[in-house]
Every structure is written in structure tokens, then in C-alpha cells.
A protein has these predicted regions:
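Conserved, mostly hydrophobic/aromatic
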Residues: 99, 190, 253, 304, ...
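Solvent-exposed loop/turn segments at secondary-structure junctions
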Residues: 82-86, 104-108, 147, 153-158, ...
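Glycan-recognition patch characteristic of GH18 chitinases/ENGases
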Residues: 38-178, 416
């Protein structure tokens, strides 16, 4: 049997050992160069989108290439709370300028909380570091939007102790800048909710802290926007917020214009009535909130908070939209949050038992709950009420809107369609 022909045999016979080594070296160098060139896009993508793997990022890039970001005439923000992250699959990132994670809580020493009061893992911190959040951040950035983070202190004593400590403020500012740079964030939202009247010195302390936060962000994370949340009565009862002094360091003010009536209210009522305060039908309303704030702020500094939810109360009389609420108990039932999606899919929130309140620009329904036999009244948001709020924000020439919360509309496209009709150029 003939010996197989070696194609390199003649070359090997004529090459000296030194030349063989030189050729092998060149081949190896060539392979290394090719591998380096091939790896450059990998590491570049990893640099651009550090919260997810390059392979996922490439798949997101391919997906959003055919779904370009819409050209919007206003900012369209959406809050993504950690407890809603499994409901984000249907959000339209092409219609959102900003997605803001809610939230990392802070203790009175300025540390981002990793444990709660029961020494359990803090759910906000846990979710912040898990794949669903990291992937949402990358998707937002790839789709053409900005990813943001809410830093929250919701306890009066913690707010007081924090603001009275320079070292606590430094701790939080340092940690915030670290998170911004680590995840390529472009927006920090401060949510300091002090209830009641704070000690006189705290407002000045909050202003000074906000100034320091803005200075550090500008220095160490250039281009990062700093926003703060305001409450519905902040225009006339400023509490912690020296609004006119804050204008120089705060880019925009997100107004939480909802929860005018809550699960703890004595009676049923609209979560965000557009009107009704002047006639005393409602204790306060959205129009009055912004009328007050526009005396202190230019419209282009204001972001209008938009609720995608309402509440469903056990009440004394289902025929009265402002009926007194029954004490919450197993016998009477409990107040429930009623998201747009749930109201949309449940027939008892769309029948003859429902009416649209023209003053509040919000629907309500009265019905009897079969399991308890008790009357209930639900106030919630539907497409008509959301459209009224979007149009109000546009007509007032506000900087934009902020949805509370993303995912409350489930897979229904209605509100995305209205947002597109209202804010796409």
C-alpha cells in the first residue's frame, strides 16, 4: 500500500530548524492577533453595557435595531419598583426616555440598606443586584433610553438623623456615585418623604445636601441628572423642600400627584382627581397641586406623576362614590390596590354600575362583594382618565410625565397607544 503523501514534507525537508521555529512563531502571533481583534467588540460591548453579558447585549441590540426609539417631544419616565420586576415584559422601551429603579433605601448613617429592621435581606438591594434589574437597565440603554435609580428615606427620624450628620451625607453621596458609574446610570432621583412639619433647620440641611450631591455627580459622573420627588401639597406646605433654593441644583422635580385618597382614607375617593378642591367635593386636586407649584417653578422643571392604579374600598353605601369606608377586617374585607390592568380585565369595573366623574376626570364603580356581602366602591384610572392627565401635562408644557408604576397596565396596549399619540413628534 502506498505511503500517504504529506503536503508539508517537501517544505520541512528544505527548511532549516531555525526557519521552522520562525514560521511557527509567526503563525502563533497571527492567531493571537486574530483572537485579540475578535475580542475587541466583546470587551467594547461589555464596557458599554456592564450590567449584562455581551451575548445578551448583542441579542438586545439585534432586537431593538428593528424597534427604533421614538422621537418624543416630552420626557416619558417610568418607575420600575423591585416588586414589579416580573411585570416588565410588556413595557414599551421605545416610548420611554427614562426607566427609574425604585428603590434603594438608606439608613440614618447614609448607608444603602442591605438588611431591614428584622435583619433580613433588604428586598430593594437584593433585586438591584439581580439579573432582572441588570437586564432591564441594559435593555433601556440599548433601546435608546436612560436608566435611573431612586434613593429613598421614608422615615422621619432617619431623615432627621441623616441630614444632621455630615459624615452620613458623605457616605450616601460616595455610594451613589459608585452605583452610577458601575451601572452607567444617567439619573438619580431623591425620594425623602418627611410627613408632618420638620424641624426648621432640616429644610436648609436638605438643600445643602442636595447641592453637595449635585456637585459630586457633576464632578465624578458628568451628565447625571438629579431629580427630587415632591408631594401633592409641597407648593403650599413645602416641609423639607426649599423649592426656590433647590432650583439651582435640582434638574427636575417629579411631582407625586397621586394618593389624594389612599387605602387609609376615611372615605372612598379618586386617587388623582383633576378638579374638585374649589367646590370642596375633594379635599385637594391635581390642578391645585400644579397651580401652587407653578408659582415657584418654571413648567420645564416639572415632571407630572401619573398613577396607573386606584383603590377599592369596603364601604357603607355602594351608590355613594364618597361613601365612608368600613373598618378593614375579615368580615368587611380590605382595601385593595386596583391597577389599570386588573380593572381592565374584571367585568365588574366596566358595567352599568360604573360612572365617569367629570369633575375628577376619573371613573368609579359601586358593587357588592359576594364573599362578604359588603358594599364596595372602587376609584381607578382608565384610558379616558389617563388621556386627560397626559393632555394636561402637555398643555401645561411640563417637562414630561412619570408613570407610577410600569407593569400596572399588564399586556394591554391602550395606554402605550395614548402615550404615543400624545408625546411622539
Amino acid at each position: 500500500m502506498d505511503k500517504p503523501i504529506d503536503p508539508f514534507e517537501s517544505i520541512n525537508r528544505h527548511l532549516a530548524p531555525s526557519k521552522k521555529k520562525s514560521l511557527l512563531k509567526k503563525v502563533l502571533i497571527g492567531i493571537v492577533v486574530i483572537l485579540i481583534l475578535l475580542s475587541i467588540p466583546y470587551f467594547w460591548i461589555q464596557h458599554l453595557y456592564p450590567t449584562t453579558s455581551p451575548f445578551k447585549a448583542i441579542s438586545y441590540l439585534n432586537y431593538y435595531r428593528s424597534r427604533p426609539h421614538q422621537d418624543l417631544n416630552k420626557s416619558t419616565m417610568g418607575f420600575a419598583p423591585y416588586w414589579q420586576l416580573d411585570k416588565m415584559q410588556d413595557i414599551r422601551l421605545d416610548l420611554l426616555t427614562d426607566v427609574i429603579y425604585f428603590s434603594l433605601t438608606v439608613d440614618d448613617q447614609g448607608n444603602i440598606a442591605k438588611k431591614n429592621a428584622k435583619s433580613e435581606d433588604d428586598p430593594g438591594w437584593v433585586a438591584w443586584n439581580q439579573a432582572p434589574t441588570n437586564d432591564l437597565i441594559a435593555k433601556t440603554q440599548i433601546a435608546g433610553g436612560r436608566a435611573g435609580l431612586t434613593i429613598a428615606i421614608l422615615d422621619n427620624d432617619k431623615i432627621k438623623n441623616f441630614l444632621l450628620s455630615d459624615s452620613s451625607q458623605t457616605n450616601l453621596i460616595t455610594s451613589t456615585v459608585k452605583e452610577v458609574n458601575k451601572k452607567h446610570l444617567k439619573l438619580i432621583n431623591l425620594d425623602f418623604e418627611y410627613t408632618g412639619e420638620p424641624p426648621e433647620e432640616l429644610a436648609g440641611k436638605f438643600t445643602a445636601f442636595t447641592n453637595k450631591m449635585k456637585q459630586e455627580l457633576s464632578s465624578k459622573a458628568p451628565g447625571t441628572e438629579l431629580d427630587i420627588n415632591l408631594m401633592v401639597r409641597s407648593g403650599r406646605d413645602p416641609g423639607l423642600f426649599e423649592i426656590e433654593k433647590l432650583k439651582s441644583s435640582v434638574d427636575r422635580f417629579i411631582v407625586m400627584s397621586y394618593d389624594y385618597y389612599t387605602s387609609g382614607s376615611d372615605s372612598a375617593g379618586p386617587v388623582a382627581p383633576m378638579n374638585g378642591a374649589a367646590s370642596k367635593k375633594y379635599f385637594f386636586d391635581v390642578t391645585t397641586t400644579y397651580s401652587d407649584l407653578l408659582k415657584l417653578l418654571p413648567a420645564d422643571k416639572i415632571i407630572m406623576g401619573i398613577p396607573y392604579y386606584g383603590y377599592d374600598w369596603p364601604v357603607e353605601d355602594k351608590s355613594d362614590p364618597r361613601s365612608l369606608a368600613l373598618p378593614q377586617s375579615d368580615a368587611n374585607g380590605y382595601v385593595e390596590t386596583l391597577s389599570y390592568g386588573r380593572a381592565r380585565e374584571d367585568q365588574k369595573f366596566s358595567g352599568d354600575n360604573c360612572q365617569f366623574d367629570e369633575l375628577a376626570q376619573t371613573p368609579w364603580c359601586g358593587y357588592t362583594e359576594p364573599t362578604t356581602g359588603k358594599d364596595r366602591v372602587a376609584w381607578f384610572e382608565n384610558a379616558q382618565s389617563i388621556k386627560a392627565k397626559y393632555n394636561y401635562a402637555k398643555n401645561q408644557n411640563f417637562s414630561g410625565i412619570a408613570i407610577w408604576t410600569l407593569g400596572y397596565d399588564k399586556a394591554y396596549p391602550d395606554l402605550w397607544d395614548i402615550l404615543k399619540q400624545t408625546f411622539v413628534k
